[in-house]
């Protein structure tokens, strides 16, 4: 049976961040579910919503920002710890987690998904 950490351990750490994914694995997940979107300059990043408003200190659509701009975003969560993390690229995610014997569920978001090349 696959136990997915949905956006990581998003009840305890900011969703779709390294801290959330590692915590999900520490809590016993053997799979990670995440969302991939493209930035304005074509970088694939992990983020669920179309806009940054709900979970970050930035406003507006993710696709309107470049990766250099998004690197500065602070990602908060539904957790009340006051802790924040940052947006990561899909490449960084793969480099960190492909070494583990786990499953992945990747949802491609946005209007440009047919143009995504891995």
Residue ranges and their predicted role:
Residues 1-118:
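Phosphate-group recognition and catalysis centered on beta-loop-alpha active-site segments
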């Amino acid at each position: 049976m696959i136990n997915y950490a949905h956006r990581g351990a998003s009840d305890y750490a900011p969703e779709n961040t390294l801290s959330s994914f590692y915590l999900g694995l520490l809590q016993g997940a053997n799979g990670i579910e995440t969302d991939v979107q493209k930035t304005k300059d074509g970088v694939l990043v992990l983020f669920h919503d179309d806009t940054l408003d709900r979970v970050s200190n930035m406003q507006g659509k993710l696709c309107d920002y470049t990766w250099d701009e998004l690197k500065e975003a602070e990602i908060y969560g539904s957790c009340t710890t006051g802790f924040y993390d940052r947006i990561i690229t899909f490449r960084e995610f793969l480099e960190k987690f492909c070494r583990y014997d786990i499953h992945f569920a990747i949802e491609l978001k946005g209007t440009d998904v047919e143009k995504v090349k891995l």
